């Protein structure tokens, strides 16, 4: 019996093979690979092992096969569905906002989202959701920030769903 992931890519049409290696890295700029792997129930590094190229430019021996793609697409879709229901309520209490953002985005933390949608630096979202004695001196979430964050999360969900759609096309 062959372990999932060990088969050659010949089980999948060429267009889907090309799509996996072209589109998945783009998606991983927005979504942590660990979040997808956790949803799939596979070990950490499972995705990167299959995306890495060898020195001669070819992909490593362990590649995606049809069974891998089914699990991968299912996991991405489930994460996208979770993101579609994220709606961050505004509260003057910064700790409440921070806690809600952490809980809502703990599975899919996206620093690029903060950069693109909120105009913050890469670490700003983490900075605003951190806790500690100096919390009161840190930047506060504004109602506008949280509205942009909610919109950004939903746009990310659409991106994830369209990834699966792309791979399903013949």
Sequence positions of predicted segments:
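Short, charged recognition helix plus adjacent turn
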Residues: 10, 55, 81-103, 107, ...
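Secondary-structure boundary/capping signal
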Residues: 32, 44, 80, 121-122, ...
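DNA major-groove recognition helix of helix-turn-helix/homeodomain DNA-binding modules
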Residues: 62-83, 139-161
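Short alpha-helical "recognition helix" segments of helix-turn-helix
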Residues: 32-40, 108-118
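A short, Lys/Arg-rich alpha-helix, primarily the initiator
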Residues: 2-33, 77, 85-109
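Short, charged/polar micro-motifs that form catalytic or ligand-binding hotspots
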Residues: 26, 37, 62, 103, ...
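Recognition helix of helix-turn-helix/homeodomain-like DNA-binding domains
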Residues: 43-64, 121-141
């Amino acid at each position: 019996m062959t372990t999932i992931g060990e088969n050659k890519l010949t089980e999948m049409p060429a267009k889907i093979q090309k799509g996996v290696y072209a589109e998945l890295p783009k998606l991983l700029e927005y979504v942590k690979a660990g979040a997808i792997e956790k949803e799939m129930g596979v070990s950490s590094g499972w995705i990167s092992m299959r995306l890495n190229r060898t020195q001669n430019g070819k992909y490593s021996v362990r590649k995606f096969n049809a069974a891998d793609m089914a699990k991968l697409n299912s996991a991405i879709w489930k994460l996208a569905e979770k993101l579609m229901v994220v709606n961050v309520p505004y509260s003057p209490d910064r700790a409440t906002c921070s806690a809600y953002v952490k809980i809502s985005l703990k599975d899919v933390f996206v620093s690029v989202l903060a950069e693109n949608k909120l105009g913050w630096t890469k670490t700003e979202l983490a900075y605003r959701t951190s806790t500690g004695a100096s919390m009161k001196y840190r930047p506060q979430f504004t109602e506008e920030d949280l509205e942009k964050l909610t919109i950004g999360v939903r746009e990310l969900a659409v991106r994830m769903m369209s990834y699966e759609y792309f791979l399903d096309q013949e």
